[in-house]
Amino acid sequence: MGLARYLQAAGVEVIEVDRPNRQARRHHGKSDPADAVEAARAAHNGRVQAVAKSRNGKVEAIRTLVVAKRSARQARIKALNQIRHLSFTGPDELRARLAGLATARLAEQTAALRPRPGAEVVAYATRVALRTLGRRILALDEELAALNELLAELVAAAAPQLLAVHGVGVDTAAALLVAAGDNPERLRSEAAWAHLCGVAPLQASSGKVTRYRLDRGGDRQANQALWRIVMVRMSTDDRTRAYVERRTKEGRSKREIIRILKRYVAREVYRLLSRP
């Protein structure tokens, strides 16, 4: 990504190739040199025309915080699962003391444990391990709080119009901004944005039946963000609930309705991103 920034700063047009041509891979196999050659050919012959993200503004700063937040969240979940496992398999006294505690209380209780050096070796080691994991969770909670605060400030500065949309929170807006990049004008059209988010309808018709299916490609974080917006609106927005009811009566499945709604939301978001 540093190379792309350097070339863009020098006035060189940088084309982004998301993935190698699958047909070429089937014929020639997979290797880094072959993928590089195929990417160069795709950019040279115009088959791929996506302009690379500039990665030099607020959105790139947001992306770095999102990476750190995702890592901290995953580490917290992992530590919590390890605490539950150790407390379940540990000595009876610890298991009884920690059973049924809520997550926050569990972290506090384990972080406050005092291992006794003269105790039986398994009990002592288990207390040390639980205390270590409990303190790790509390430290990660502080990290997440600091990251959330800074992330909220950056998202509000980068796209206040996005936060005003019904169903859009800081994390959702951050995912959509990262997908678009610091230079959303690189997106050729609203349809290109929908394809990037994995909500472009794909034909799945057969015979006289005309239908579409979900797109499994695209940016999965942006796709998940659109899904969260739709879920919020299906629960709290009267227009969306009326639409779902009408479509259900027409025979549409819930999955199809969600796909259509995600496409509508993608169109709404694109207009906000392209005209801040």
Language-model segments: which ranges?
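A detector of single, family-specific signature residues
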Residues: M1-P276
